[in-house]
Swiss-Prot record:
Phosphorylated. Phosphorylation promotes binding to RNA. The gene is RMD9. Binds the 3'-UTR of mitochondrial mRNAs. Involved in the processing or stability of mitochondrial mRNAs. Residues 1-37 form a transit peptide. This is RNA-binding protein RMD9, mitochondrial. The lineage of its organism: Eukaryota, Fungi, Dikarya, Ascomycota, Saccharomycotina.
Length: 616
């Protein structure tokens, strides 16, 4: 099946040429390209393509070993006479053992039921990472702190970032308060550690190699701190200008590093496309061999610049010259065409080939890429029918592959954003189309709670209580139990409706409290208080000239007065009162009345799990 690997983008050149914006000459060229491709395919059945088949199949079947030794096969010896001998050995042990653990693929660990080094299954992983940073600070002035040790530490921090992100993304529901706090703590630790190492590198306190710099930049990129990548890159350029022989200046031009920074530099308008292309060619010619990272970076840059033909040409070169161990780069680039190519016909072609499994490499179609494609379609021409077509296709595809509910939730959330944007001013036709979509989704996959919750949350743009009632009835119709999240959305939705009563607010609030209590909650969560705030305070602020606004503020104060004893702690109570008043001035104007409001009309729920942590 790999005989098409070297010809992949030849196929896609036809897609570019036959797009709506293509010229007649390009159409003719595309047809000729397809004829040539067909002829070559028939004439080379037993030629080089079959040899490539055999070689790649051999690699992927395990007959040819492509395993790489840790740290590139190098090992930094420790001099037993060194005064830092014990600490260096401890650091090497932390790096070697923990780096090997964290490099284990998540999918294999889950299928083998092996504990992954994450916050739940193996807290010693994070202890080792923390220990490694402590040892680094003790040792960074010693001569044995080699570029390989610093690189391994940065690599370990990068793996820690990915481990944390993979765990959060694999959850079927949002993380609880403790998990969320741990997640933030770990990300902050990694960010602070990388900043410290970056400063040491720029101040020439420690060395690093190209692989380490690549991991450093990639870590910042994955955390969303691309501005820091640009800052560090500029500082390295200044160092290189002042000292052309500096090691950091040389390794910054390594293809693996340039491949990471090229799309960032272009996106931040540090370089234009011609300058990016020049840097790519200089780097390619100097090293005189294929570096997949460099090609992926230039392809991403080309897509950002809307240089789609250039991107396809580079993709063809990448496919032609890559070895079996590089198929991951090809798969990554395939996804980039889906998510970043502004020529929708090209992006959709890449999506279709992945869905139909027509490629000689495996493509895991990330839902974020599909969401980006839908966004690009809406941005280009607001073609909702095309968006709906892709949504239906992917619901079917993900359903056939039995992917987790979070994938569908992300896809549906994106899709219904465009649906309600299209029908925002036409709720009669919109409701008719919504009913059809619910039926279609049920036929394709089956109705699930997140699907209905997304519609509940977004249909509030119509400000129509009957629509909310209709969606709520679907829970019973399709035998979908309403969770605590659903109850929050239903309370929050009252903030989109005029002329509601206090009884409606209180009824929805009690439903939340009792459900939380039945689940064993010890306190009323922030999300519960936020739903109450949106139903009352937020509506009051948006309609402050309406007499009813003061009524809703009164209801909020009454309910808080009765139920604030179930706050987790004093900081949570501050958040729902003074903290909330900072964003909503209408609440600040009435906050002093908290202890004066009449609470006799607010019933107190009988609870078993909720604890009175605070006194009123």
């Amino acid at each position: 099946m790999f005989r098409y690997l070297s010809r992949t983008s030849t196929i896609y050149k036809g897609v570019i040429a036959t797009s709506k914006t293509a010229s007649t000459a390009n159409v003719v060229a595309a047809q000729e390209s397809r004829r040539n491709y067909a002829n070559k395919r028939n004439n080379n059945r037993n030629g080089p393509a079959d040899a490539l088949d055999e070689k790649l199949n051999s690699i992927l079947s395990g007959k040819t070993s492509s395993k790489r030794k840790p740290y590139g096969g190098r090992k930094s010896p420790v001099d037993e006479t060194s005064p830092w001998y014990a600490q260096l050995c401890a650091l090497d042990d932390c790096l070697t053992t923990t780096l090997k653990q964290s490099a284990t693929p998540m999918r294999k660990l889950l299928s083998d039921r092996v504990n992954h080094p994450d916050m739940r299954s193996n807290p010693t992983f994070w202890h080792s990472v923390s220990r490694a940073m402590t040892l680094y600070n003790e040792l960074k002035q010693c001569p044995e702190m080699t570029d390989q040790r610093v690189t391994s530490l940065v690599h370990l921090l990068h793996n820690g970032l990915r481990t944390d992100r993979q765990l959060v993304s694999s959850l079927n529901k949002k993380p609880d308060y403790d998990s969320q706090s741990f997640h933030k703590e770990m990300v902050n630790f990694i960010y602070t550690s990388l900043n410290e190492i970056s400063d040491d590198i720029l101040n020439n306190n420690v060395p690093i190699n190209a692989n380490g710099l690549m991991h450093l930049f990639t870590s910042y990129q994955e955390m969303g701190f691309t501005d820091l990548v640009v800052q560090i890159w500029k500082k390295i350029e200044t160092i290189a200008e002042q000292n052309p022989q500096s090691n950091i200046g040389k390794i910054s031009k390594h293809p693996n590093v340039v491949g990471i920074v090229l799309p960032i530099l272009y996106e931040k308008e540090i370089v234009n496309f011609s300058e990016a292309e020049k840097l790519f060619k200089e780097c390619e010619q100097y090293h005189n061999r294929m570096f997949p990272n460099l090609y992926v970076g230039m392809i991403l840059t080309s897509l950002k610049a809307n240089e789609n033909m250039k991107a396809l040409e580079l993709f063809e070169t990448l496919c032609t010259n890559s070895k079996g161990v590089h198929y991951g780069y090809i798969s990554e680039t395939h996804i980039a065409f889906i998510s970043q190519c502004k020529d929708i016909s090209v992006a959709e072609s890449f999506l279709d080939k992945a869905v139909n499994n027509e490629m000689p490499y495996r493509v895991e179609i990330q839902v974020s890429a599909v969401n980006s494609l839908m966004y690009n379609i809406w941005s280009e021409n607001q073609d909702f029918n095309k968006i709906k077509e892709i949504w239906q296709k992917m619901v079917t595809f993900y359903g056939e592959n039995n992917l987790r509910l979070a994938i569908f939730s992300s896809l549906n959330n994106e899709f219904f954003s465009y649906f309600f944007e299209k029908y925002k001013e036409n709720k009669t036709e919109g409701l008719e189309q919504l009913q059809k979509l619910i039926t279609q989704y049920n036929n394709l996959k089956g109705i699930d709670e997140p699907f209905l919750n997304i519609i509940l949350a977004k249909c509030t743009v119509w400000k129509e209580p009957e629509v909310i009632k209709y969606i709520e009835k679907n829970f019973e119709l399709f035998n979908v139990p309403k969770s605590l999240i659903t109850s929050r959305i239903l309370l929050k939705s009252l903030g989109s409706i005029d002329n509601i009563t206090k009884e409606q607010i209180v009824e929805r609030w009690q439903e939340i409290v009792l459900k939380a209590d039945s689940l064993g909650s010890k306190y009323i969560a922030n999300a519960d208080w936020a739903a109450l705030r949106d139903a009352t305070v937020k509506w009051a602020q948006e309609n402050k000239d309406n007499q009813e606004s003061l009524d809703r503020i009164e209801w909020y104060l009454q309910i808080v007065n009765v139920y604030q004893k179930y706050c987790r702690d004093g900081s949570q109570r501050y958040r729902i009162l003074k903290g909330c008043s900072k964003s909503f001035p209408i609440l600040a104007e009435n906050l002093q009345r908290l202890d004066l409001v009449d609470t006799s009309s607010i019933p107190v729920c009988e609870v078993k799990s909720l604890k009175e942590a605070l006194q009123n």
